[in-house]
UniProtKB/Swiss-Prot annotation:
It is found in: Cytoplasm. FAD binds at G11, A12, G13, H14, A15, G16, V123, S178, Q367. The gene is mnmG. GO terms for biological process: tRNA methylation; tRNA wobble uridine modification. This is tRNA uridine 5-carboxymethylaminomethyl modification enzyme MnmG. It comes from the Bacteria. GO terms for molecular function: flavin adenine dinucleotide binding. It comes from Staphylococcus saprophyticus subsp. saprophyticus (strain ATCC 15305 / DSM 20229 / NCIMB 8711 / NCTC 7292 / S-41). Keywords: Cytoplasm, FAD, Flavoprotein, NAD, tRNA processing. NAD(+) binds at residues 270-284. Its cofactor is FAD.
Amino acid sequence: MAQEYDVIVIGAGHAGIEAGLASARRGAKTLMLTINLDNIAFMPCNPSVGGPAKGIVVREIDALGGQMAKTIDKTHIQMRMLNTGKGPAVRALRAQADKVLYQQEMKKVIEDEANLDIMQGMVDDLIIEDDVIKGVRTNIGTEYWSEAVIITTGTFLRGEIILGNMKYSSGPNHQLPSISLADNLRGLGFEVVRFKTGTPPRVNAKTIDYSKTEIQPGDDVGRAFSFETTEYILDQLPCWLTYTNGDTHQVIDDNLHLSAMYSGMIKGTGPRYCPSIEDKFVRFNDKPRHQLFLEPEGRNTNEVYVQGLSTSLPEHVQRQMLETIPGLEKADMMRAGYAIEYDALVPTQLWPTLETKKIKNLYTAGQINGTSGYEEAAGQGIMAGINAAARVQGKDEVILSRSDAYIGVLIDDLITKGTNEPYRLLTSRAEYRLLLRHDNADLRLTDLGYELGMISEERYARFNEKRAMIKAEQERLNGIRVKPNDRVQEIIEAQGGSRLKDGILALELLRRPEMTYDLILEILDESHQLPSDVEEQVEIQTKYEGYINKSLQQVEKVKRMEEKKIPEDLDYSKVDSLATEAREKLAEVKPLNIAQASRISGVNPADISILLVYLEQGKIQRVNN
């Protein structure tokens, strides 16, 4: 007899984990199926979490009640805040992970989660009736029934590893690929593309000459992704920086014909922002060297990840390359790098909830949707889990807008514009990045996480206390007048500021570019009384208030366009005067509102005007009828 669940998640990578946990935490009886229970939360590529934009996604997942932030906080070997010399909109955390410890911790979280079962099994078929998902069937014939299914298969769908002139069926890190499920999706009529990614060699730490490299330590202050973390890992391991050189490039040039990238062996499209070393050599042949970061894979292993040396060159050529790199001349290669090709769905086949348009109650998240990166996968996973549970429970779906979160930017880009290469989230993709900062992810999303039942009462009470403290401190500073005495003038002039002519409110003084919250306390002759994150919010919100308000005004304009809904079943062939390309793109994407329609590539302002007139005429006709 088939077992029954509310939601089934296929895959236990970074998307699958957040999907399964979100579904379970919303109260849905959830099953997670994975090819290998020992590879839950495996990091097949770089041993890190975070970075520009991506680190903010991790904070957003945490604010919604997800898991990635908490787990990396417990298992990292190093953490750094990036872009500290720039404005708050581009600051982000990046952590080096202990890969094995991360997996162990995440597996324990999953096993301990109420409402979540986990089972080893390979899904071969989707059980579908009348274009509605009903369950899944494994390769040994076991059936599991459910009201919703989330596919989070990463790079396993028809995966093929390529190394030199060798190509063989495989998932990442030489695991079993998923062939039958890939065939099943193609047979259902989904539009599929082939993408490619790669990984560099790993070398033995005992054989590296670190004296020829530059040390890259973590921050010497406690850092955390999760807003709940209170204990910090200060015993950190450094990374190391080295470079390729002319000799390295000569090895690549001599053997370029052996690279799967250039021999025609690889057909899939690779990631623009994480190219292989041979691709960097060809595309940037004027550069005398390229950075390589040596990243330990954990505290209890000698494996070191050579970040920046991703390659599909044969194993013997990889060894030759390593011999030319300062510090790695005598390094033992423990694992060779490789490229991997896999199937991905064209993401314009999805609704904003990540439900497929073709099959009702079937959701997809992660690399199957054309993205790259653990964080992008996890961000999609939590939203798919939230919405699959909502569908089963008859609750409202949840869609994050581009002004709500980087997760909203990511999903909107995918479903509206699609992608012809593995999609990487960048700060530059967000038009409201001053609103979507690392520091305010909790202020943006904790209310929603609480409404969804994924934030505890205790955590929500602490959050509300923080929010109240921020407001109270702003009001307090706005009620204190600073007099221009000699001591105050000296403090201001020491920072390069102009002297005060008259008294000024402390909050107004904080708006000056040279002033900080610390200096305001010094001027007021006060000591620190508030948590550092509260002080940070007071300073950022005050200094950037004008810019933030301008962004909020833009958001309001877009929201008015979002209120102009477009019927899902609108026949664009009946909309006169639309350009042919616009008509085709609109029919493919099926935008839910005018704002989304305006972001579709190939749809210009004239098309939007025509669409608006058509919709208004339709309303008038319905009223008259």
